[in-house]
Amino acid sequence: MDKLSSKIRAEFLGFFKNSGCAVVPSDSLIPAGDKTLLFTSAGMVQFKQHFLGQSKDSFTRATSCQKCFRTSDIDQVGTTARHLTFFEMLGNFSFGDYFKKEAAAWAWEFLTKNMSLPKDKLYITIYKDDDEVAGIWKNIAPANKIIKMDEKTNFWNMGETGPCGPCSEILIDLGQETGCGSPACCPECNCDRYLEIWNLVFTQFDKQPDGSLKNLPRKNIDTGMGLERLSATVNGRKNVFDTDLFMPVMENAAEILKIKNEGSNISKLRMIADHSRAITFLISDGILPSNEGRGYVLRRILRRALRQGKFYGYNKPYINELVSDVLKIMEGAYPELSSKLSNIRSIVKTEEEKFLETLESGSEILSSLINSYKSKDINIISGKDVFKLYDTYGFPHDLTKEMAFENGLEIDEDKFKFEQKKAQEKSRVAWCGSGERDITFYSILRKKTGDTVFTGYDNYASESRVLALIKDGSEISELKTGDNGEIILSHSSFYAQSGGQSDDKGKIANNSFESIVEYIFKPAGNLFVHKVKVLKGLIKINDAVSTIIDIERRKQIARHHTAAHLLHKALREAFGGHITQAGSLVARDYFRFDFTHFSALKKDDLIKIEKRVNSIIRLNSEVCIETMAIAKARNAGAMALFGEKYGDEVRTVLIKNESGDGNYSMELCGGTHVSRTGDIGIFKIISESSAAAGVRRIEAVAGIAAENYILDEEAVIIKTSKILNASKEELVNKAHKYTSDYKKLENEFKSLKSSLISGEIDSYAKEVKKINGINFLSVIADKADIKALRTISDQLKEKLKSAVLLIVSKNEDRASFILSATADCVQKGINAGKIAKAFAASINGSAGGKPDFAQGGSKDLSNLNDAVKNAHKYILL
């Protein structure tokens, strides 16, 4: 009977716990506080500060099962026995504690005793010059199983300089049948016979610029072993996909696609299973599909998986269904998946639906393009055409490349990159002047001045000293009347924009100097940069000044920030634990709160949420600020922002519950808040909308802003009452009556317009052309709306009996069209939807529809007349 992967995972962590290691939970796939990495790709990532000796954690040895994601081998996923994008890395670590002897002995014990792997099948590779580890292994394993390798395979470097060290790899012989067949095949061979299971890295040196090695004061251990590989090995499988981590997903995918999990289908099903796991965990960790960064990678693998279904003629969303299979397998180790299932599935399904639409329209345009290139015997699609597909129609570059390859063509990569870069440059020009500054400049400045001490939690004003002055991007010695510049202070009561909260406004002044503070930001660490306009006087470095904030602005922002915490909690109460903050803006006039949720909130839901928040406000509950250990805060249930890097000590905002003996809300937060919920006054939701796939957005107001909003609404009602000559009580009924009367008049007008159109039908009918035995007519009906176009089309079909009709309306800034075909033309192979898309492409527009009817439009009128005249050519496609 197979050993479950969940049991292997638990046994590994238990083994090293018994060896004195702290069991550390998996970190997010978004590396916390490390902007050099796009994803967490190894178990050691979350321990970087420990390896550098900069962590305040008490443990010096640890073990973990870390979620990892890599795309370096994405093209090999499904085609080999071992490559994956998402995987779990089992690891044990030492930070100046145990070293080679213990690491080697424990690894061998766990594999041979706990996992019962045959000793005669295991091999150990070591660095050729590491005599220390060679001696250790000789006391553990047979000498003929220990193989010395060179620096390329068995010496780890962080970079050209810095921490480095030798490593030992443990491999297992999977048998001759899996290898290259050569009699000389050995662990040094690159075939599939010898599978690396575990890598033990011994970080003991500091590489110098001249290449020499110095001993590190603290020697560290970093090991990594893929759970998927170990599970396959323990259960006698030659392939990671033949384990309980993948098989249920593959089997359900095969059932959905109505194919067998065998033969040529296997590689596609493996890719689908791998990508489904990755998609589930990426979204669970807060990544959403987008066109850049992590979101783009997610979008790419989701689309890549979905497209495998189209290979079998399956044109519906299905990856979202596989998310449930992933959950069943993984929820024991990652219980947070359960509360997020509905949201993850909704996000995936929405993205699938969008891509299927893109794929349909883009594929047809690309197919037409490919046929055009083939007819001209051109084998390379221009980069300009590839970029247009990407930029105008949202068709992925990598998909264009794949489809071109399938048709024996290539794409001009260099020209595509040139067009892409050109578009990026345009974007940069538009972006210039947005206020972003060179972070390197401020990082260097911070080393000289140190961080700013923020005094604003308890004080609206503070005494300070000028540490640096900046103008036009350069340090200067003074600022004078009329100057715009930046001031760096030793202390500041101003809140710098961060954590979604807007910055303070106010003054920096002394007896002979006064400036208005326009913006405060933190470009590096806790260095506060105050952008100012000097009203009078002169300020120099080392001058003493006072910082004085706009108190009413601060109080109003605080009302909004505390209200945002109440809203967050109320949403989780109403809809469940899958609700998490996905972004926010806390300003003076309003606040915006983005949260993960799979559907729009109903009006009744919004009323319920609003009432709940106001009920907590009326309780006048105490709002407490406590600084506590991060572990204590998390254990107490404090909400934390995903992807944020927190120190060992965190600032926690607690809002007391109804009885006052517990907390209604508890969040890690560095922002400013009211002292009691009653200080908020009143809370009012002003809108709810979609912010992104799987993310909803609520905009709301509180305090004075809510009061002003309600007064404005009241003013609109009063004004409307006067216009309609109705009391408030009569207003709704009277508005309904006027609306009803307007619709009647509108229908009468349309009827009259339709009568006028009917008079044009005979003249239109005279323009019919015969194309391959098909009656084809294309006409422009100026300024007709879409309903009028339908009327013209219906009347022409009735008159002509058999025809394909393109009826176009041209207005001031847009063209709209419908394309219809009678039933007999459809039977002859005419597809109105395809013709409409081809025509839309010729006018830089878009279209969609069915074989008998389609519609579309474009904002580009430059080529419209010629395109309509030449539209008959699409009948020939």
From Swiss-Prot:
PROSITE patterns named among the record's database cross-references: AA_TRNA_LIGASE_II_ALA
Stored SMART domains: tRNA_SAD (SM00863)
Subcellular location: Cytoplasm
InterPro entries per the UniProt record, alphabetical: aa-tRNA-synth_II/BPL/LPL, Ala-tRNA-lgiase_IIc, Ala-tRNA-ligase_IIc_anticod-bd, Ala-tRNA-synth_IIc_core, Ala-tRNA-synth_IIc_N, Ala-tRNA_ligase, Ala_tRNA_ligase_euk/bac, DHHA1_dom
Catalysed reaction, written as an equation: tRNA(Ala) + L-alanine + ATP = L-alanyl-tRNA(Ala) + AMP + diphosphate
Cleaved signal peptide residues: none
Keyword terms: Aminoacyl-tRNA synthetase, ATP-binding, Cytoplasm, Ligase, Metal-binding, Nucleotide-binding, Protein biosynthesis, RNA-binding, tRNA-binding, Zinc
Assigned EC number: 6.1.1.7
Cofactor binding remark: Binds 1 zinc ion per subunit.
Record-level Gene Ontology MF annotations: alanine-tRNA ligase activity; aminoacyl-tRNA deacylase activity; ATP binding; tRNA binding; zinc ion binding
Pfam families (UniProt xref): DHHA1, tRNA-synt_2c, tRNA_SAD
HAMAP family: Ala_tRNA_synth_B
Protein purpose: Catalyzes the attachment of alanine to tRNA(Ala) in a two-step reaction: alanine is first activated by ATP to form Ala-AMP and then transferred to the acceptor end of tRNA(Ala). Also edits incorrectly charged Ser-tRNA(Ala) and Gly-tRNA(Ala) via its editing domain.
Record remark on domains: Consists of three domains; the N-terminal catalytic domain, the editing domain and the C-terminal C-Ala domain. The editing domain removes incorrectly charged amino acids, while the C-Ala domain, along with tRNA(Ala), serves as a bridge to cooperatively bring together the editing and aminoacylation centers thus stimulating deacylation of misacylated tRNAs.
Protein name: Alanine--tRNA ligase
Taxonomic source organism: Endomicrobium trichonymphae
